[in-house]
UniProtKB/Swiss-Prot annotation:
InterPro entries: MinE, MinE_sf. The keyword NAD does not apply. The lineage of its organism: Bacteria, Pseudomonadati, Pseudomonadota, Gammaproteobacteria, Legionellales. Keywords: Cell cycle, Cell division. NCBIfam families: minE, PRK00296.1. This is Cell division topological specificity factor. It comes from Legionella pneumophila (strain Corby).
């Protein structure tokens, strides 16, 4: 292994690390703009749905997208095949 190969490999590692840091920073910036009530809203929505359907926390996703003149609240729920009533019978 020559010194040039060693230095070339480190450069690619540095670029990968830089790319990963940019992704992390972008994610952190997007999280900073979320309102404080969003986690509480997600918990309350989960509680209401859990009354009727057997569902876990990771099956409910709440996102807020802000645009210039509006905001969109996106709610994604992965529903199971059957409701609680069907499984209790």
């Amino acid at each position: 292994m020559s010194i040039f190969n060693y230095l070339r490999r480190r450069a690619s590692t540095a670029s990968v690390a830089k790319e990963r840091l940019q992704i992390i920073i972008s994610h952190e910036r997007s999280q900073r703009n979320t309102p404080d009530y969003l986690p509480k809203l997600q918990e309350e929505i989960l509680a209401v749905i859990a009354k009727y359907v057997n569902i876990s926390r990771d099956q409910v996703s709440v996102n807020l997208e802000r645009m210039e003149d509006s905001a969109v609240l996106e709610l994604n729920i992965t529903m199971p095949d059957k409701a609680l009533e069907d499984s209790n019978s």
